[in-house]
Amino acid sequence: MDVFQTIILGIIEGITEFLPISSTGHLIVASNWLSIEQNETNKAIEVIIQLAAILAVIANYRDKFTLKHKVLWSKVVLAFIPIGAIGLLFHKEIKTLFTVPMVGTMFIVGGIVFLVLEHFYQERSSHVQEVEAISYRQALWIGIAQVFALIPGTSRAGASIVGALLMGLSRKASAEFSFLLALPVLAAAAGFDLLTHYSDFSRGDMLTLSVGFITSFLIAYLTIRVFIGFLQRFTFVSFGIYRIAFGALLLWLG
């Protein structure tokens, strides 16, 4: 993977990781279109790009990393358990699902889910407005919903946001809890890949790794801030439409 390809993947990861449009799906498609060989060294570079996205969440929500928020983080850990357990048990089977037809199909399915949900969803004052107010029951159900993200093209952010909306969270609170929930999920995935591809990091070009990391971090940091501002004025309908259109394009191109 050269520097240009790494920049492209860093931009894609930074934009799509925290939006409900599947970062994995976009990275699979981009890798195919850029003819990036799926060798162990390139997989290691993708891990570095994901780690940068984790740091972007920490940078945006650094005020949450205090002892007074320990209850919030216990709920985040609870929500992580379902996807962590199932992902660990079935990671080999899940890898076989990483195909363009599967990604395209799940893009469309996810888009339809968002359109249907937004048709019935109305913001109410009774909805949870701040992530600190989420109950353990709500956190668990959001975590269960996130399990669907193990299917490529579903979107981790999308699955967790849908679960949060169904559990009575506001759009803003749904997105913010999804951001925080990304930390253990991405850390676990990156940690697993680090263990399996550890030796490949020594073969990776440090310039390429650094450029990918910085690009992903900066884009992810800005995306999080813009996305929260967007949700204070708009709905998820545009994401539903995009998912259906992009999924149809993928299936058409084959």
UniProtKB/Swiss-Prot annotation:
| Keyword Transmembrane among UniProt keywords | yes
Which GO biological-process labels does this protein carry? Answer: cell wall organization; peptidoglycan biosynthetic process; regulation of cell shape; response to antibiotic
State the reactions this protein catalyses. di-trans,octa-cis-undecaprenyl diphosphate + H2O = di-trans,octa-cis-undecaprenyl phosphate + phosphate + H(+)
Q: Which UniProt keywords apply?
A: Antibiotic resistance, Cell inner membrane, Cell membrane, Cell shape, Cell wall biogenesis/degradation, Hydrolase, Membrane, Peptidoglycan synthesis, Transmembrane, Transmembrane helix
Q: Where in the cell is it found?
A: Cell inner membrane
InterPro entries with a match to the protein in the record: UppP
- What's an example GO cellular component term for this entry? plasma membrane
Q: Which GO terms describe its molecular function?
A: undecaprenyl-diphosphatase activity
Q: Does the keyword Kinase apply?
A: no
Membrane topology summary:
Multi-pass membrane protein
Pfam families the UniProt entry points to: BacA
Q: What is its EC number?
A: 3.6.1.27
Q: Which residues cross the membrane?
A: 1-21, 41-61, 71-91, 97-117, 147-167, 175-195, 211-231, 234-254
Name the HAMAP family on file.
Undec_diphosphatase (MF_01006)
What does the sequence similarity comment in the record state about its family?
Belongs to the UppP family.
The miscellaneous comment for this protein is: Bacitracin is thought to be involved in the inhibition of peptidoglycan synthesis by sequestering undecaprenyl diphosphate, thereby reducing the pool of lipid carrier available.
Q: What does this protein do?
A: Catalyzes the dephosphorylation of undecaprenyl diphosphate (UPP). Confers resistance to bacitracin.
Its protein name is Undecaprenyl-diphosphatase
Q: Which organism is it from?
A: Desulfotalea psychrophila (strain LSv54 / DSM 12343)
Q: Which gene encodes it?
A: uppP
